[in-house]
A protein has these predicted regions:
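N-terminal Rossmann-like NAD(P)+-binding domain of SDR-like oxidoreductases, especially those catalyzing
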Residues: 1-84
Length: 84
């Protein structure tokens, strides 16, 4: 059976981090969209994700940038997308 892929916007927030952890426990390949500034200082902006960070695929982007979103969706091709 093919591993499902999920893409989460808002993955750095409380709900996004809980959802990511839950989906990982179900065997999903989890991808998240984060703003570039979060990747520049991960211990400050990504602290909720630190326990699971090694199992996540994070992509730099913003919902205001159609080209960035298009590239992420094209590259990831998620089975499910969660906008939080």
């Amino acid at each position: 059976m093919k591993q499902k892929k999920a893409l989460i916007t808002g993955i750095t927030g409380q709900d996004g981090s809980y959802l990511a952890e839950y989906l990982l426990s179900l065997g999903y390949e989890v991808h998240g969209i984060v703003r570039r500034v979060a990747l520049e200082d991960p211990t400050h902006h990504l602290w909720r994700l630190l326990p699971i960070a090694d199992r996540l695929n994070l992509h730099s982007g913003t919902l205001e940038s159609y080209p960035a979103l298009y590239k992420i969706f094209r590259d990831v091709q998620p089975d499910e997308c969660y906008h939080l």
